[in-house]
């Protein structure tokens, strides 16, 4: 294996580390360590913000054409931007208790469809609809400590926009 090929695989490993970050974040949320969970959510964003640059610099599509880095990216992004924040919303008691399960199902379902849209972005790279950044929503709902019914309406409204 050449050094360039090894570097290309390391970039994919870097992206895949997002899955580990997502899993550890879920564990922290279950333990009610919300501040630590937000730090890891931020780490996931940092990985997501930089892995594409690294992939282009390492020419991963050219060197490893049989590996679909875009699919890996989507899997990791869905975990970090949808599953983890929904788990957070559930365990941080930000939603009405009697409605929390069906409410967190809305972003899970709408974002699953959103992630599969081939035309998710405009020609100038803006998202069509709400771009499934549920981690940001979870952060603001937690920081603002808005009433659970307001949070429920927010989740419902944004799920429709996806």
Model-found features: residue ranges?
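Alpha-helical transmembrane segments and their membrane-interface exit regions
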Residues: 45-50, 107-115, 156-162
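C-terminal membrane-associated helical module and adjoining short loops/tails
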Residues: 124-162
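C-terminal ends of transmembrane helices
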Residues: 54-62, 112-125, 162
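Topogenic membrane-insertion module of multi-pass membrane proteins
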Residues: 1-52
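Multi-pass membrane catalytic core of lipid/isoprenoid biosynthesis enzymes
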Residues: 11-16, 57-114
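Cytosolic, membrane-interface loops and tails of multi-pass inner-membrane proteins
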Residues: 1-2, 50-69, 128
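Membrane-interface loop-to-helix entry segments
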Residues: 10-16, 75, 127-137
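Helix-coil boundary and interhelical linker segments in multi-pass alpha-helical membrane proteins
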Residues: 24-40, 75, 79, 83-105, ...
């Amino acid at each position: 294996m050449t050094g360039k090929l090894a570097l290309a695989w390391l970039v994919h490993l870097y992206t895949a580390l997002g899955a580990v970050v997502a899993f550890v974040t879920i564990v922290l949320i279950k333990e009610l360590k919300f501040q630590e969970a937000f730090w890891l959510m931020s780490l996931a964003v940092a990985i997501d913000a930089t892995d594409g640059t690294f992939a282009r610099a390492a020419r991963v599509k050219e060197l490893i054409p049989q590996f679909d880095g875009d699919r890996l990216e989507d899997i990791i992004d869905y975990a970090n931007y949808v599953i983890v924040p929904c788990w957070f919303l559930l365990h941080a008691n930000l939603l009405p208790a009697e409605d929390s399960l069906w409410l967190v199902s809305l972003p899970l379902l709408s974002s699953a469809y959103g992630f599969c849209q081939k035309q998710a972005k405009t020609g100038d790279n803006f998202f069509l609809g709400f771009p499934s950044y549920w981690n940001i929503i979870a952060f603001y709902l937690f920081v603002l400590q808005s009433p659970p019914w307001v949070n429920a309406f927010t989740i419902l409204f944004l799920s429709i926009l996806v």
